[in-house]
A protein has these predicted regions:
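N-terminal Rossmann NAD(P)H-binding glycine-rich loop of SDR-like oxidoreductase domains
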Residues: 6-26
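Active-site-lining helix/loop region of Rossmann-like oxidoreductase modules
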Residues: 9, 144-290, 294-297, 307
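N-terminal Rossmann-fold cofactor-binding loop
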Residues: 33-37, 55-56
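Short acidic/histidine-rich motifs immediately flanking catalytic phosphotransfer sites
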Residues: 47-48, 66-71, 92-95
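Conserved Rossmann-fold cofactor-binding substructure of NAD(P)-dependent oxidoreductases
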Residues: 53-81
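ADP-ribose/adenylate-binding Rossmann-like module
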Residues: 89-107
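Rossmann-fold NAD(P)-binding glycine/threonine-rich loop
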Residues: 101-122
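C-terminal helical cap and adjacent loop that interface with cofactors, partners, or active-site loops
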Residues: 271-358
């Protein structure tokens, strides 16, 4: 029997369409929703799914939309603009909340509602895609094997081709500068500086510190007070980042310029095509250390990031509806570090082949 007890908001977005495909493949019939009927109705007609059109500022329609579902999956980014109203409604009407954010402020905000979510017997679980399931689970995995770990580094590859929504979110975040976690606190850092080399399953990459959701989520999952998150960049780009990023920060600090660029992104950027999604791989690395010098490293080899997100989001929703966790939780907090291995196509390594592990 098809399961139609959850709703996708922002169903017309690039990633949302992939999630819908996976949901249908796995026997679900989610209700699809968004702000604009001209964008939502064609998807409903193509898929045979029920739909509802509403703006998040319309409390009456929001209540109606949530009245017959057990879970909301928010796919409408940047989530800093959409998550609060949906979280408020989910708490009010006792509906589980999920999304695919990677935005640190959104994670910080969600954790403020943990006790209220627990009292209302629902879960608030942001980040059920590439942000942050693989890194969250891998961080928890290595942390569990290093007693009293004090330092956690996380790095990944695989964002060479990104969706309009991801790029718009990056434009939103760049003006704020970089972040790292030190002694349990988030502190500013210089975007584009601090590169290092990391060995991944496909070889060595240069990685550079970036703002990633794990700066907040991994702190809750592991309790480790010092966390840095990195992304792989092509070697030719690395020398230009310390100069280029400050220029972008100044440009995108102007709200008009930022909105123009985000509108251009909507028009021009299409996201990875089917061939890229089917054939590319992404890799995640995590390292935990303690003050005695004990260290544990591990790697994940996963499908292309958007393919992974589509599968992972639906598997997460299934797990939430089955296990019924309560509170504001990360995926690893709710389901454990091995949860990522339930997702099709994922491999975890404690050691790499000799040719790569130098």
């Amino acid at each position: 029997m098809a399961k139609s007890n959850w709703l996708i908001y922002g169903a017309n977005g690039y990633t949302a369409r992939l999630v819908i495909e996976q949901a249908i493949r796995r026997g679900h019939k989610p209700i699809i929703a968004g702000r604009t009927e001209a964008k939502i109705r064609p998807i409903a007609e193509q898929t045979g799914l029920d739909y509802i059109v509403f703006d998040l500022t319309d409390g009456h329609l929001l209540k109606k939309a949530l009245s017959n579902v057990k879970l909301v999956f928010n796919a409408a980014g940047p989530f800093i603009h959409t998550s609060q109203k949906l979280i408020d409604a989910c708490l009010k009407y006792r509906v589980n909340y999920t999304d695919i954010t990677g935005e640190v402020p959104v994670f910080q905000n969600v954790f403020l509602y943990s006790k209220q979510a627990e009292q209302n017997k629902i879960v608030l679980m942001p980040g059920i895609g590439f942000d942050v399931i693989p890194s969250d689970c891998l961080a928890k995995y290595v942390a569990n094997q290093v007693p009293n770990a004090v330092e956690l580094d996380i790095a990944f590859t695989g964002l060479e081709h990104i969706s309009p929504g991801t790029l718009k979110t990056m434009v939103e975040m760049i003006p704020g500068g970089g972040l790292i976690r030190r002694d349990g606190r988030l502190i500013p850092s210089h975007l584009g500086k601090g590169s290092k080399k990391v060995i991944f399953p496909d070889g060595e990459h240069t990685v550079v510190p970036i703002i990633w959701g794990d700066l907040e989520t991994a702190y809750h999952s592991t309790g480790i007070p010092n966390i840095t998150t990195y992304m792989a960049y092509p070697n030719f780009m690395v020398p230009f980042l310390p100069v280029g990023i400050p220029v972008m920060q100044r440009i995108f600090a102007n709200n008009f310029a930022k909105r123009v660029v985000q509108r251009l992104i909507e028009i021009v950027v299409k996201g990875p095509d089917k061939a890229a999604r089917e054939h590319r791989r992404a890799y995640v690395w995590a390292s935990a250390k303690n003050s005695n010098g004990d260290q544990k490293r591990a790697w994940l080899d996963i499908p292309e990031t958007y393919s992974f997100t589509a599968i992972a989001a639906v598997v997460s929703i299934e797990e939430i509806l089955s296990v019924q966790p309560k509170g504001a939780l990360t995926p690893a907090m709710a389901f454990g570090p091995d949860f990522v291995l339930k997702i099709e196509g994922v491999k975890r390594y404690d050691n790499l082949p000799a040719q790569n592990n130098k």
